[in-house]
């Protein structure tokens, strides 16, 4: 069906600044140097100082989860989970099986929610021209949808025509809202989906708005609320009602509805769009991958978490899928040489991390980010869906092998094509399909366990002095919270988050972060509308671009755009 084209490339030479790229979980500024239409160098700068580590110092360790969740309004639960796990480790408590399974189920809903939101509402519009859907033939679009996905009412010619009519009225009103000044308006060389695919994707974009609510509602059934769940406690969970029949039945019903959309829309849409952009299987790659693993069958310690996660943990270096190393938590450290922090913090393990801000100036390539630069044995590591997918695939995990091979077969590309922006985007769909395939089984396991024994929380005592680490593999990637307790209070707390791994600055040796590495070689068709930069950066899921400033190198004119 798909006819992939080569990505167009200009002859432009000069700098481009995209600022800000995201309005969630920090404001991101990307600066690149372009030579003959390709990115030659890149700098990733976080513009938001967080300071949660400073806020937490001196507080009760049990309070950590309530503060750290506020780092983000999208992937909120993962910080509660990592904080709870790090205090679990510090007090040396082994949580009950019911608590482990309930925590895992809420994480499963987080995956469904985040990956759907990312594909349709944060990333798809880097590839899909919404206004081009007006040129589509709804009958052809319906036939195309029937050829790539199971029959469903929303894919009928009548339903697609209704979406097209709604879109037409929206465009003719002149009030384009979130699409105002979008890169695809007026046409763009880098957008080349057939109008029928644009129409199908736009219809599912709208439907996905309802699906994300259902996924969030499922999280709230077990988590108490969304965002910012309130069911995790040190030693387990507090939602005893979540073990009973009606809440679990409601959770299952919502999950089934979301997963039906995943299988009938998300995966077919992903494959359809990717089929027209297959050359992006050679753009945006990195070299090294790290995963802490998730959905563990034994969470009694960080070591057990690493060893028993159903989404496996591991380390891959140099793209060598023939060798997956075990994770050594002692090999993680953070550099601050290129960050806006006082010197002396380089090479610090998170237990000993120092957060001492020292801002210089914006246009400073020696110090240019509020993020630190995490490294593993001296190497920058990509974390997230692609890292998890490669590690699971290389380890021969059956679920991953089945879905990855299906995707590779449908696209007729080798596994090496996944080292890319395209692969990073596909990996999210792969994971979502696997979560859906296991969801009903996981729910039944908890229901059966809870029917026999409803224990949800284990007893423990706060030590005078201790330390602990909480590991999680959030939808965006490897997350770790590190705590030192002294006098039963937080003496030091450090968060090493996925965006820090992926989007941080250079390390002490001048080595680029994953996003900086991934941007090298990216072709730019139109330097005033550099959608290609957004494609690669958004593939790491720093969320959504709300405003872009592109600096024209000769006149220093700042061109302002709002980007969807």
From Swiss-Prot:
EC number(s) stated in the UniProt entry for this protein: 1.12.2.1
The protein's name: Periplasmic [NiFe] hydrogenase large subunit
Miscellaneous note of the record: Perhaps the leader of the small subunit serves as a transport vehicle for both subunits.
Compartment annotation: Periplasm
Primary location recorded for the protein, binned into one broad class: periplasm
Binding-site residues for Ni(2+), renumbered to this chain: 72, 75, 543, 546
Cofactor(s) recorded in Swiss-Prot or TrEMBL: Ni(2+)
Keyword tags: Metal-binding, Nickel, Oxidoreductase, Periplasm
Assembly mode: Heterodimer of a large and a small subunit.
Transmembrane region(s): none
Family in the record: Belongs to the [NiFe]/[NiFeSe] hydrogenase large subunit family.
Catalytic activity line of the entry: 2 Fe(III)-[cytochrome c3] + H2 = 2 Fe(II)-[cytochrome c3] + 2 H(+)
Pfam families: NiFeSe_Hases
Organism: Solidesulfovibrio fructosivorans
InterPro entries in UniProt: Ni-dep_hyd_lsu (IPR001501), Ni-dep_hyd_lsu_Ni_BS (IPR018194), NiFe-Hase_large (IPR029014), NiFe/NiFeSe_hydrgnase_LSU (IPR050867)
Cellular component GO terms, alphabetical: periplasmic space
Free-text remark on how the cofactor is bound: Binds 1 nickel ion per subunit.
Propeptide, chain numbering: 550-564
GO molecular function: cytochrome-c3 hydrogenase activity; ferredoxin hydrogenase activity; nickel cation binding
Class of enzymatic activity (EC top level): oxidoreductase
């Amino acid at each position: 069906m798909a006819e992939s084209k080569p990505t167009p490339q200009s002859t432009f030479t000069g700098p481009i600044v995209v600022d800000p790229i995201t309005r969630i979980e920090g404001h991101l500024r990307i600066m690149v140097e372009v030579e003959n239409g390709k990115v030659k160098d890149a700098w990733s700068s976080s513009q938001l100082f967080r300071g949660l580590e400073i806020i937490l110092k001196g507080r009760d360790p049990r309070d950590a989860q309530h503060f750290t969740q506020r780092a983000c309004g999208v992937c909120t639960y993962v910080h509660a989970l990592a904080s709870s796990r790090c205090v679990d480790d510090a007090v040396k408590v082994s949580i009950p099986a019911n608590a482990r399974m309930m925590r895992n189920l809420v994480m499963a809903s987080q995956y469904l929610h985040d990956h759907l939101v990312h594909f349709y509402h944060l990333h798809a519009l880097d590839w899909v021209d919404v206004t081009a859907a007006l040129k589509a033939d709804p009958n052809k679009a319906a036939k195309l949808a029937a050829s790539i996905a199971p029959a469903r009412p929303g894919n009928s010619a009548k339903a697609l025509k209704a979406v097209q009519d709604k879109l037409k009225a929206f465009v003719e009103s002149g009030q384009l809202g979130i699409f105002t000044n979008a890169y695809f308006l007026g046409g763009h060389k880098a957008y080349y989906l057939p109008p029928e695919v644009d129409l199908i994707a736009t219809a599912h974009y709208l439907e996905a708005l309802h699906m994300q609510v259902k996924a969030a509602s499922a999280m709230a059934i077990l988590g108490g609320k969304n965002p910012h769940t309130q069911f995790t406690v040190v030693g387990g969970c507090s939602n005893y009602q979540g073990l009973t029949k009606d809440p679990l039945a409601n959770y299952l019903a919502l999950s089934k509805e979301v997963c039906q959309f995943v299988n009938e829309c998300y995966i077919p849409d992903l494959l359809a769009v990717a089929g027209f952009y297959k050359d992006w299987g050679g753009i945006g790659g990195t070299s090294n991958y790290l995963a802490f693993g998730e959905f563990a069958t034994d969470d009694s310690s960080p070591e057990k978490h690493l060893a028993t996660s159903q989404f496996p943990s591991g380390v891959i270096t140099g793209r060598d899928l023939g060798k997956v190393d075990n994770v050594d938590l002692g090999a993680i450290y953070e550099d601050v040489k290129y960050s806006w922090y006082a010197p002396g913090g380089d090479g610090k393990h998170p237990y000993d991390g120092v957060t001492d801000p020292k801002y210089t100036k914006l246009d400073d390539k020696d110090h240019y980010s509020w993020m630190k630069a995490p490294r593993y044995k001296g190497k920058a590591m990509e974390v997230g869906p692609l890292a998890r997918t490669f590690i699971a695939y290389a380890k021969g995990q059956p679920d991953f092998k089945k879905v990855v091979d299906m995707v590779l077969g449908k696209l007729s590309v080798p596994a090496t094509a996944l080292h890319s922006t395209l692969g990073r985007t596909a990996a999210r769909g792969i994971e979502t399909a696997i979560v859906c395939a296991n969801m009903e089984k996981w729910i039944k396991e908890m229901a059966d366990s809870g029917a026999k024994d409803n224990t949800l929380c284990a007893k423990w005592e706060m030590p005078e002095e201790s330390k602990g680490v909480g590991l999680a593999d959030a939808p965006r990637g490897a997350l770790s919270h590190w705590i030192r307790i002294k006098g039963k209070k937080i003496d030091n707390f450090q968060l090493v988050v996925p965006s820090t791994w992926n989007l941080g600055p250079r390390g002490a040796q001048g080595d680029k972060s994953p996003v900086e590495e991934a941007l090298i070689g990216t072709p730019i068709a139109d330097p005033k509308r550099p959608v290609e930069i957004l494609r690669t950066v958004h593939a790491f899921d720093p969320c959504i671009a709300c405003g872009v400033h592109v600096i024209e190198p000769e006149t220093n004119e700042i061109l302002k755009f709002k980007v969807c």
